[in-house]
Amino acid sequence: MRYCHFFSAGELRLGVVDECGVLDVTAALSRTRMAVPDSLEALMRAGEKGQSQMERLLRTDSYRLPAEELRYAPAVPHPEKILCVGLNYTTHTTEFDMERPREPVLFGKFSNALAAHREDISVSRYARKLDYEAELVV
């Protein structure tokens, strides 16, 4: 099951993504009396029980939002920490003519470094160069 956070009327919502679109969990819960975690954090804390409750909700509510029309929020909207691994792609090390490190190169970022879907990325006026890099979250 794939989950997402998205914005609806300025409010952060939990969604479940399937082949038909995105189930708005908050809206679905307002149409039922089921006890289902209403945030990704609560869902993770609930473990398998929360997962089975969400599967039941998904089966009972057929209304979906079109995925392409949503404005997605970061998967974890308010992380305590953001730990990053640098130089983890061979192409990135060769681009800078560097040897691949033997041990992971770790660095941190502040939570305000997150940008939601279709949000502008703020660039410091002191920045001299920007470089793209794909980020993975596990």
Predicted segment positions?
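Structural signature of FAD isoalloxazine-binding scaffolds in flavoprotein oxidoreductases
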Residues: R100-H117, Y132
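N-terminal non-catalytic cap/leader segment that marks the start of a structured domain
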Residues: M1-P104
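Residue-level detector of alpha-helical recognition elements and their boundaries
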Residues: S30, F107-G108, S122
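A structural-propensity feature for long, helix-poor, extended segments
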Residues: A116-V137
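Beta-hairpin (beta-strand-turn-beta-strand) motif
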Residues: L87-T90, F110, Y126
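Generic secretory/membrane-interface signal
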Residues: Y63, P74, A113, A127-K129
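Structural motif
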Residues: L12, G21-V22, S111-A113, D120, ...
